[in-house]
């Protein structure tokens, strides 16, 4: 079995800037309506989703949490947060730190999708 993750966005170029330059994912393919992002062996499809033919909005890009979200484990949370913000991300609250050198940051990508950056505690 193989898992690929689709991230629905309203602007592919802004999403590529965020996930590529901001979070450091490789972007081997970038088209007008979609892009392929890779982290190790994990594939992410960045997909532009427009309103349906009736004009009704199929997806709402207001900030929300769902039962499923992405956690990216990083070595230097401060550096990755800085790059993510420079690439169009939004920090939803201050970085939460623990006493063992770890931390977590809750961010939104440019389309409002929630992600977490996790720096594991030092052993």
Can you say where each PLM-predicted feature lies in the sequence?
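Vicinal oxygen chelate
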Residues: 1-3, 25-72, 81-108, 119-123
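Conserved active-site tyrosine of GNAT-family acetyltransferases
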Residues: 15, 19-20, 84, 112
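Conserved beta-strand-loop-alpha-helix junction that forms the acyl-donor binding cleft
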Residues: 9-11
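Short, conserved charged micro-motifs
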Residues: 14-15, 77-81
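Short glycine-/small-residue motifs
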Residues: 114-117
